[in-house]
Regions:
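Sec-dependent N-terminal signal peptides
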Residues: 4-13
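Lipid interaction determinants
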Residues: 17-88, 96-148
Length: 148
């Protein structure tokens, strides 16, 4: 189960429980486009607490560009007093609009859930890791903002 979404793995130190019934979409909302992660929340099942991490200005330079069948993530990280590009990864994906599940090619058993999608905001949730080691996977929620 170590099929971790590489670009998010370094950033995912946080998540909040969210109900899939809260899915919100506008007429022209689409995951297609360029996004950055504004914040990440990790809801830990062991203590029922949410840890929130907001993106630094350097982390906001990291982008995730969704095209019709693949996504390219460009990662930036601080190095000394500079913000440098550290990685570029392109992966094929599938987005099922009926159930709002998103997964990478060959990883259907490790889905992400799009719980909100508007023209400017996207919320993606997963339950793939147990951060607090209590035997229950925790909920990681990533809040994306579209880049104009």
């Amino acid at each position: 189960m170590k099929k971790i979404f590489l670009p998010f793995a370094l950033f995912s130190m946080a998540a909040c429980a969210s109900d899939s019934e809260d899915f919100n979409t506008s007429n022209d909302a689409s995951i297609i486009g360029k996004w950055y992660i504004e914040k990440v929340e990790v809801f830990k099942s062991k203590n029922q607490q949410t840890q929130t991490m907001t993106s630094t200005e350097c982390k906001k330079k990291s982008t995730h560009e969704f095209k019709s069948t693949n996504m390219t993530s460009i990662t930036f990280a601080p190095q000394g007093n500079n913000c440098i590009q550290t990685d570029v990864v392109t992966r094929n994906y599938t987005f099922n609009t009926a159930n709002k599940k998103f997964w990478y090619e060959g990883e259907q058993d490790y889905p992400y859930y799009i719980t909100q999608l508007t023209q400017t905001d996207m919320v993606m949730e997963d339950r793939l890791e147990d951060f607090d080691n209590d035997g229950i996977n925790d909920v990681i929620t990533r809040f994306f903002k579209r880049i104009d």
